[in-house]
């Protein structure tokens, strides 16, 4: 028998490190207590089985969560707090990085910002000539399946902060991150407009449910 099996999540974490915890144990660590019928580990396991994953659980809305037996407003607040803490962590990490040396940092930040949006949002990260983040903005918002993007507005914002480069991103609320022909055409327009002002477009990421597509990785930029 694995000697870690009889340890509670907190003790296991302190002895073996946070990475040793399973998803069930990590969730139980935050929930702290279970219900009248289930201990915290059994309850955490039941929640993950019901929703299918940590992502689905933390993305669920209030009605979906409080419909679960034993999950009242207190636990709802805990779960939403965990999700918001993660989102703010990635946001602060992006801003405080000396430079964007890791594409995964950018991707994780954008996923934390856009995955749960119910309509299309177009974001831009503005960078200096050393790839340090100057600012990030949600410049355009649209409908469930479309967002109108104005390349000149992107350039105008870039000039305001003296940006040397930008990273584009938008989400697909439908779940599939596969870029449409319209996505490719607007990206080409933004690239041309930025190039005229000597601003580099490093990438355009399309964010779906648990997946993404990078224009740079596909060789489209």
Swiss-Prot record:
What region holds the MPN domain?
99-221
A biological-process GO annotation: proteolysis
The family database entries (SUPFAM superfamilies) matched by this protein are listed as: JAB1/MPN domain, RuvA domain 2-like
Specify whether Protease is a keyword of the entry: yes
Protein origin, superkingdom: Bacteria
Pfam families documented for this protein: RadC, UPF0758_N
Binding positions for Zn(2+)?
A: 170, 172, 183
Q: Which family does it belong to?
A: Belongs to the UPF0758 family. YicR subfamily.
Q: What is this protein called?
A: UPF0758 protein KPK_0116
Per the UniProt record, the lineage of the source organism begins with: Bacteria, Pseudomonadati, Pseudomonadota, Gammaproteobacteria, Enterobacterales
């Amino acid at each position: 028998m694995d000697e870690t099996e009889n340890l509670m999540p907190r003790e296991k974490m302190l002895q073996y490190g946070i990475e040793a915890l399973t998803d069930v144990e990590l969730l139980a660590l935050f929930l702290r207590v279970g219900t009248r019928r289930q201990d915290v580990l059994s309850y955490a396991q039941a929640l993950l089985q019901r929703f299918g994953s940590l992502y689905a659980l933390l993305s669920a809305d209030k009605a979906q969560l409080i419909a679960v037996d034993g999950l009242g407003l207190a636990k709802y607040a805990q779960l939403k707090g965990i999700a918001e803490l993660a989102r703010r962590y990635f946001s602060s990490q992006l801003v405080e990085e000396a430079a964007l040396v890791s594409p995964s940092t950018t991707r994780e930040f954008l996923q934390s910002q856009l995955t749960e949006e119910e309509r299309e949002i177009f974001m831009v990260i503005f960078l200096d000539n050393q790839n340090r983040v100057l600012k990030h903005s949600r410049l355009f918002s649209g409908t469930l399946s479309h967002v109108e993007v104005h390349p000149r507005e992107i350039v105008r914002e870039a000039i305001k902060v003296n940006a040397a480069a930008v990273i584009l991103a938008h989400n697909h609320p439908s779940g599939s991150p596969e870029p449409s022909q319209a996505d490719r055409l607007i990206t080409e327009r933004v690239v041309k407009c930025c190039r005229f002002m000597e601003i580099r477009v490093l990438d355009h990421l399309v964010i779906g449910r648990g997946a993404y597509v990078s224009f740079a990785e596909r060789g489209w930029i």
